[in-house]
């Protein structure tokens, strides 16, 4: 089992969700986060004064999948989230030792 975390632009959430759902993945956790990468924020003008916005609003989504779905899910996320501009985001894939469904006690693949 793998955990796929993706940090994307908020405007791309619906597209990414649809792409993942089309693969038959039904579980998804979404977080509203703030951060910066290489772009290190940006400056904005407000009432004639320039302000530096260090942390940009992003969406982080997390999905747990079996090994066979890792590459299709990564492709669905990249295809749906890519604009070709700085700030499109990152994807992190990590190994997962176990998953436990609290309600039933099911473990592993049965708990996904």
Identify the meaning behind each predicted range.
Residues 1-112:
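Positively charged, small/polar-rich N-terminal and surface patches that mediate targeting and assembly
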């Amino acid at each position: 089992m793998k955990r796929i975390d993706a940090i994307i632009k908020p405007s791309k959430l619906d597209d990414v969700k649809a792409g993942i759902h089309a693969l038959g993945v039904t579980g998804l956790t979404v977080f509203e986060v703030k951060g910066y990468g290489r772009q290190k924020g940006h400056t904005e003008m407000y009432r004639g004064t320039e302000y530096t916005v260090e942390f940009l609003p992003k969406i982080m989504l997390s999905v747990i999948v079996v090994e066979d779905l890792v590459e299709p899910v990564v492709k669905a996320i990249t295809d749906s989230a890519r604009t070709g501009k700085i700030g499109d985001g990152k994807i992190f894939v990590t190994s997962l030792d176990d998953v436990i469904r609290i309600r039933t006690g099911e473990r592993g693949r049965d708990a996904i």
